[in-house]
Amino acid sequence: GLIKPTSGDIKYQGVSIYSQGYKLKDLRSKVGLVFQYPEYQLFEADIFTDVCFGPKNLGLPQEEVEKRVNHALKQIHIEHLRDKQIYKMSGGEKKMASIATILAMTPDIILMDEPSIALDPRNRRSLIHILNDFEHLKIIASHDLDMILETCSRVILMSGGCIVCDGDAKEILTNQELLEENGLELPFCLQKPVW
C-alpha cells in the first residue's frame, strides 16, 4: 500500500508487511488489483500490450509473457480483442481487459473494486465462473450482492467506513433486516417478485 494504517497490521504468509526488511516488491508480484474504473488501469494503446505489461515487469522471458497473456485473454473470453485499441472498446470490454491484466500476473491474491460494473449478463456470468475457479484469496468490494452470494463464502459488511458484521456469506446476505439497516437489499435472486 501507499499509506500505512494508523492501527492494525497486514500479514502475508504470517509475516507483517510492515516489518523491517520486508520486500514489498515481492508482495506486489503476488497481489493483483482490479480498479473500479478500468480507465485508471489500462494505459497502453491495445489490449495485448497492456496485458503484457505486468508479466514483462516481472522479468519473465518473452515466450512466458506471451503464454500468460494468451491464457488470460482466453480465460476471460476476449482473445478476439487482442489487437483492439483500448479507446475503441466498450466499458464492459475494458473491464474484462483490466481483469485479464491481473490474471496474466498469476497472483496469489486478487483485490477487486466493483468488478461487475459495466458488464453485460454474459460477461458477468463469465466473471463469476472465473472467480469461482480462482483457487487463491479474493477480496471483493461490491454492491452486486448476487455475485457475492455466488462467489464468496465470507462477507464483511461495512457501512460508513466501519465493519458492521463479518461472517458466513449466506447468513449475512439472507438477513433482510441487517441489509436494509445498512442501505442494502436482499440479493435479487432472493427477492420475491412484486407484480
Give, region by region, the residue ranges found by the protein language model.
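Conserved ABC transporter NBD signature motif
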Residues: 8-19, 27
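Conserved ABC ATPase "signature" region
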Residues: 63-81
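Conserved ABC ATPase signature
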Residues: 85-89, 93
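Catalytic Walker B motif of ABC-type/P-loop ATPase nucleotide-binding domains
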Residues: 110-113
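H-loop/switch region of ABC-family ATPase nucleotide-binding domains
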Residues: 142-143
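A short, surface-exposed alpha-helical micro-motif characterized by mixed small hydrophobic
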Residues: 148-150
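Conserved beta-strand-loop-alpha-helix hinge in the C-terminal portion
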Residues: 162-185
